[in-house]
């Protein structure tokens, strides 16, 4: 618990890592407490860093464990392992339609056909190529409403494609955004009238997420891979 009082240290580690998110977790009883930091500060909900924590716990800290519960700023989050997939259960964001503005067009570099507000601004674009080829003006994106900018369109090989931009959190582009799909998945599941969708995040790194709804929750599944094991020296 003393570890989690060192918020300044966590922020500095996240800044030094300079990745979209750095996760900090500690075991408390049978559960884990989990917090996430970007180079620009703390977030209340993060997907792929949660999946990464579950991967480490299940494969290194508690080998053979197939279910992990996390206590977070967004309440209890769970991760269940099914083969090589890790299934996360997150709260869905309620989407409110908003007017498409010239400011959105100027910032994004394309005119949305629809726009919605949850925690983030969700902009639906004309087609997949527009999403993939987008070069937004991040100096203008930072002035749009919403914490992050989510852009999405119907996909050709998957149900939808998306990208996530987070200059307010000092993250130009998030490679794969789990919390973003708490906006994106509810939209496309309703739009396509499907029970489940396959979503592709079309960032330079890219990633596939399998999504379905469970009441007011989004159930997302994805894969994880070990990149490095390292020591951090705090002075």
Predicted regions and their residues:
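Active-site proximal loop and beta-alpha junction motif in alpha/beta enzyme cores
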Residues: 1-46, 51-235
């Amino acid at each position: 618990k003393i570890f989690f009082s060192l918020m300044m240290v966590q922020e500095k580690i996240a800044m030094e890592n300079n990745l979209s998110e750095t996760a900090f977790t500690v075991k408390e009883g049978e559960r884990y407490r989990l917090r996430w930091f970007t180079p620009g500060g703390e977030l209340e909900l993060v997907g792929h860093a949660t999946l990464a924590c579950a991967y480490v716990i299940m494969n290194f800290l508690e080998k053979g464990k197939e279910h992990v519960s996390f206590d977070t700023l967004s309440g209890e989050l769970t991760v269940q392992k099914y083969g090589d997939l890790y299934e996360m259960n997150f709260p869905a964001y309620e989407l409110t339609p908003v007017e498409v503005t010239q400011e959105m067009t100027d910032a994004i570099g394309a005119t949305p056909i629809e726009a919605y507000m949850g925690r983030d601004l969700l902009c639906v674009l004309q087609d997949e190529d527009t999403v993939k080829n987008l070069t937004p003006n991040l100096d203008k994106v930072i002035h749009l409403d919403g914490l992050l900018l989510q852009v999405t369109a119907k996909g050709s090989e998957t149900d939808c494609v998306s990208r996530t931009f987070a200059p307010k959190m000092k993250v130009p582009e998030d490679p794969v955004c789990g919390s973003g799909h708490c906006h994106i998945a509810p939209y496309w599941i309703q739009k396509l009238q499907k029970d489940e969708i396959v979503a592709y995040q079309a960032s330079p790194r890219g990633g596939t997420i399998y999504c379905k709804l469970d009441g007011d929750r989004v159930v997302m599944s994805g894969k994880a891979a070990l990149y490095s094991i390292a020591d951090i020296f705090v002075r």
